[in-house]
Curated annotation (Swiss-Prot):
One of its GO terms (biological process) is bacterial-type flagellum-dependent cell motility. Transmembrane segments: none annotated. It is a lipid-anchor. This is Flagellar L-ring protein. Belongs to the FlgH family. Assembles around the rod to form the L-ring and probably protects the motor/basal body from shearing forces during rotation. GO terms for molecular function: cytoskeletal motor activity. GO terms for cellular component: bacterial-type flagellum basal body, distal rod, L ring; cell outer membrane. A lipid is attached at C17 (S-diacylglycerol cysteine). The lineage of its organism: Bacteria, Pseudomonadati, Pseudomonadota, Alphaproteobacteria, Hyphomicrobiales.
Length: 238
């Protein structure tokens, strides 16, 4: 009996745990600055053909479309600014109404006379009928309304160059206010020609863009259910 009470008490205590013990009373730590980003190797892009080599005694470099030196980001380690200005609105309203009714009546009858062979009465009347009725109805309605407005800028670093000259960029920004850490990450592939003269590029010109904006800290922990409740939600069949 005592073991059962102890087990229930431990489950209740686990359900109330929302913060790691080592993080109680501490602000979230900032991530270390990744100075090695400019020399990252991206094996997922190794399937591209090799870049042409630079010819000796040539003023034109086949690896670049620019004849003169361009101060914009072009090689691993260079920095450019990504401008994120998202103002999306979506409003979808779907409604379906389906009804199907089917009815059927099937009947049959017959009569029998006196048998001419035995002379016995072998006659009779038979009447059989079958009625069928089917009714099916379905209705559905769905409404989606979404509005997003994000406006910010973040500096990203060129981590690699593809054989065709496109640049792989990655950027991260962390701002800690009191005990809440706001984290912004951006990554993707850009064309050098899309980078403006002031070394900026819009988010909608980034291919394979991965943009995340979130945080961690006390406010984020309050918004999340405790660990015990998450475990119970995963294994509870109800």
């Amino acid at each position: 009996m005592n073991k059962a009470i102890l087990a229930v008490a431990m489950v209740l205590l686990l359900a109330g745990c929302a913060t790691k013990p080592e993080e109680i009373g501490r602000a979230p730590d900032l991530s270390p600055v990744a100075a090695h980003l400019g020399m990252q190797n991206n094996p997922q892009f190794n399937g591209y053909p090799a870049r042409p080599g630079k010819a000796s005694y040539s003023l034109w470099d086949q690896r670049s479309t620019n004849f003169f030196k361009d101060p914009r980001a072009a090689t691993p380690g260079d920095v450019l600014t990504v401008i994120i200005s998202i103002n999306d609105r979506a409003n979808l309203d779907n409604k379906t109404d389906r009804e199907r009714v089917s009815k059927g009546i099937y009947g049959g009858g017959g009569s029998f006379a006196t048998s001419s062979i035995t002379g016995a009465a072998a006659g009779g009347d038979m009447d059989a009928s079958v009625n069928t009725h089917s009714d099916s109805k379905s209705k559905g309605k769905g409404t989606i309304e979404r509005s997003e407005d994000i406006r910010l800028q973040i500096a990203a670093i060129v981590t690699d160059t593809l054989p065709n000259g496109n640049l792989i960029i990655r950027g991260s920004q962390e701002v800690r206010v009191n005990n809440e850490l706001r984290v912004l990450n951006v990554a993707g592939v850009v064309r050098p020609r899309d980078i403006s003269g002031n070394n900026t590029i819009s988010y909608d010109k980034i291919a394979e863009a991965r943009i995340s904006y979130g945080g961690r800290g006390r406010l984020s922990e309050i918004q999340q259910p405790p660990y015990g409740q998450q475990i119970l939600d995963q294994f509870s069949p109800f």
